């Protein structure tokens, strides 16, 4: 199979490129590629006769191919050849440019060019016979020629019919088309072309291997030369590395300068350290009190800060109290006061005054009372236990009586308004006798009554102010002792005690006179064998608050009788409690 005209033109282009690159020893596939990689190379070799013949033949083929329509061939093979040439040029970049073609290994490049020319000569023997059949075969990327524009060829002796008329022999037409397609494929890939391609690849491989061997040999030669030089230098210098004299001097000067600078810096640092230490020692010697002054300063600052913090806390507390809203509405308080005043028929002003008085009284009660000198015989704590022997509970206790209640009001309530005078007030306050129970001397139940002994010892000292006669005082003490003893053993639980107390208060009798009357009644009862106490109910007899109790009473209930009177006001209060309790 012979190559067609388009194939011939493509082959000519490839041959031209190959001859320009390899015969002239230009390292690169093209001038532009070579410029990009290394720049222009100067100097060219003289062209050979084979190259001139190839160029002349390519020009003749191009002139033959020029016509009314120059179809473009398939550029696949052209691209392949260009790629191969570029690969060869990349492998041969380091080859010298001014060498002759005869220096190539085994003189293979001219043979490769000759083989390409031989293939082209064989393909160019009958180009005219295949020109008509290959006119319609265009490049695959180009647009096919229209039917109206294409020349009316006979297609191997068969006239192409018109489109309107169908073909009579379709099988023959299809067979002819298939033959043409296979012919094109055979023309593209012939055994001869494949063999040529294989030979080209082999030549390129040999070229690259030879170039590698040359590079390795050159490197080994250089290494051998370097080793020889090193061995000779070591023999002369004794194994030391060879350095130029100027560089050696410069390095020595640099090392010396660095050592000197290092030593100088160390000296400066040591001198500065010594100076600083000496300066600090001098300052410490000159100012030994700086530390104490500093500590005092900080202490003062801390104290000032604490004072300021305390002041700030006080101000914040006051602000908080001032800014706190009232929990009670003043209007609600006003309405409450008006409602209470209307219910009690009391003006609101009086209600407010009463509230203020009650509040002040409570505050006074909360205040601690001044501690008085205590007798060692008195108990530290006392409790009041009120006893009632008539079986009736008190209607009003002492705590229920207001503080400002007067004695005259109580007497009026009890129906004793005729006693509301000064003597009555005095007698009521003094009506309570001295606590002279003789349980200290004689206690049949074994209960302790040491408090009565102290009260008995106190009573004569008080009566000495009223009487100057010592004999009378002794008699009074004896009578008081005997009366208390008798009343303790034989208590009188009759209801006439209250009447006697009131009558004795009206008569102005003092407590010790009552004790004398009790003694007389007892002696009369013993002599006559009769009870004289019932006959003398109207004359009055007040028995002490404590002695009138059965012997079997609970000892915890005697504490109220064992407490001494602290003042006249307290006696008055207890008297009120006693009188009201008997109602």
Curated annotation (Swiss-Prot):
<keyword id="KW-0732">Signal</keyword>
<feature type="signal peptide">
    <location>
        <begin position="1"/>
        <end position="28"/>
    </location>
</feature>
<dbReference type="InterPro" id="IPR001990">
    <property type="entry name" value="Granin"/>
</dbReference>
<dbReference type="GO" id="GO:1903670">
    <property type="term" value="P:regulation of sprouting angiogenesis"/>
</dbReference>
<protein>
    <recommendedName>
        <fullName>Secretogranin-2b</fullName>
    </recommendedName>
</protein>
<dbReference type="InterPro" id="IPR038858">
    <property type="entry name" value="ScgII"/>
</dbReference>
<dbReference type="GO" id="GO:0001525">
    <property type="term" value="P:angiogenesis"/>
</dbReference>
<comment type="function">
    <text>Neuroendocrine protein of the granin family that regulates the biogenesis of secretory granules. Required for neurovascular modeling of the hindbrain. Acts in a non-cell autonomous manner and is required for migration and proliferation of central artery endothelial cells. Required for normal courting behavior and spawning.</text>
</comment>
<keyword id="KW-0037">Angiogenesis</keyword>
<dbReference type="GO" id="GO:0030141">
    <property type="term" value="C:secretory granule"/>
</dbReference>
<feature type="compositionally biased region" description="Basic and acidic residues">
    <location>
        <begin position="534"/>
        <end position="546"/>
    </location>
</feature>
<dbReference type="GO" id="GO:0005576">
    <property type="term" value="C:extracellular region"/>
</dbReference>
<comment type="similarity">
    <text>Belongs to the chromogranin/secretogranin protein family.</text>
</comment>
<keyword id="KW-0165">Cleavage on pair of basic residues</keyword>
<keyword id="KW-0964">Secreted</keyword>
<dbReference type="Pfam" id="PF01271">
    <property type="entry name" value="Granin"/>
</dbReference>
<feature type="region of interest" description="Disordered">
    <location>
        <begin position="526"/>
        <end position="583"/>
    </location>
</feature>
<feature type="region of interest" description="Disordered">
    <location>
        <begin position="123"/>
        <end position="159"/>
    </location>
</feature>
